[in-house]
Design a protein with these regions (language model features):
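Flavin-dependent oxidoreductase catalytic cores
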Residues: 1-231
C-alpha cells in the first residue's frame, strides 16, 4: 500500500532453482519436479496478488535455471524439456506463464526477462550452443503467445553476471573484482553478434536488441540494465 501511495506499482522478480548450483542442475530435475515448479510459481504469484502486488517478472536470463532450459550449451535433457528444438527449450517458460495467468487472472501483469544474445566470456570464440538473436526472437514470440505482457532483454555472459546488466564492465580487466574475460579493449562490433551499441552505457547499449525483438512481437519491449542519464 505504501508503494501505491507513492504512485508506483509493486512487483517481484521470480528466479528458479535452489541456492547456487552447478550448471548441470537443469539436467537433474525429474518431470515431477518440473511440474511442481510450474504449480509453485503460479501459487507464489497468486499469494503476491492477493495482498495487492501488481506484477511478477519471470527471470529467464543470465545463467539461472530457467535460462539453462533455454540454452543448448547447458540443457542436455532428452525429454520434452530438452534442447533438441526451440519448442522444447521454451516449454517450461511457457508453462509457468500460463500457470500464473490461470491462477492470477487476466488483470495481473506478467513480465519476462531474457538474454537476447549470449557469448562465452571464459573461452572467447567458443559460442557453440549459446543463444543468438534469431532464437531470442522465437522465444519472445512464444512468450507473447503464452500470455506475457512485457519482455525485457539484455545480453548473457555465463562467466560473470555483472556485465549482463552493466555492459560497461566489459571494459574492466580480468582478475579484477566483477571483471569478465573480455579484457580491457572491448570491441562491441566483435562480440554478441555486434548487437550492442557501444556509444551508450547501461541499458542504452541494449536498445538495438530491444528493437530487433520488437519487430516480431506486439508487446512492449524494454532493456534491463542500469540507467545512465548521459545516454
Amino acid at each position: 500500500d505504501r508503494i501505491h501511495q507513492a504512485g508506483a506499482y509493486a512487483g517481484v522478480q521470480f528466479g528458479l532453482g535452489t541456492p547456487m548450483s552447478p550448471q548441470t542442475q537443469v539436467n537433474d530435475y525429474t518431470n515431477e519436479e518440473i511440474k511442481a515448479i510450474v504449480k509453485d510459481c503460479g501459487a507464489a504469484a497468486r499469494r503476491l496478488k492477493e495482498p495487492g502486488f501488481d506484477c511478477v517478472e519471470m527471470k529467464g536470463a543470465t545463467t539461472d535455471v530457467l535460462n539453462q532450459f533455454l540454452s543448448r550449451s547447458r540443457n542436455f535433457r532428452e525429454d520434452e524439456y530438452g534442447a533438441q528444438n526451440n519448442e522444447n527449450r521454451v516449454r517450461l517458460f511457457k508453462e509457468i506463464i500460463e500457470e500464473i495467468r490461470t491462477q492470477c487472472g487476466p488483470d495481473f501483469t506478467i513480465l519476462t526477462l531474457i538474454n537476447a544474445v549470449e557469448e562465452c566470456d571464459s573461452a572467447l570464440g567458443d559460442n557453440e550452443g549459446y543463444i543468438v538473436l534469431e532464437e531470442a526472437k522465437y522465444l519472445a514470440q512464444q512468450l507473447e503467445q503464452a500470455g506475457a505482457d512485457l519482455i525485457q532483454v539484455r545480453v548473457g555472459t555465463p562467466g560473470q553476471e555483472i556485465s549482463c546488466w552493466a555492459p560497461d564492465c566489459n571494459h574492466t580487466g580480468i582478475h579484477m573484482d566483477g571483471a569478465t574475460g573480455f579484457g580491457t579493449q572491448f570491441n562491441y562490433a566483435s562480440h554478441f553478434g555486434g548487437a550492442q551499441d557501444g556509444r551508450h552505457s547501461g541499458a542504452g547499449a541494449f536498445i538495438p536488441l530491444a528493437r530487433e525483438i520488437k519487430q516480431v512481437v506486439s508487446l512492449p519491449v524494454g532493456c534491463a540494465g542500469y540507467m545512465d542519464p548521459r545516454t
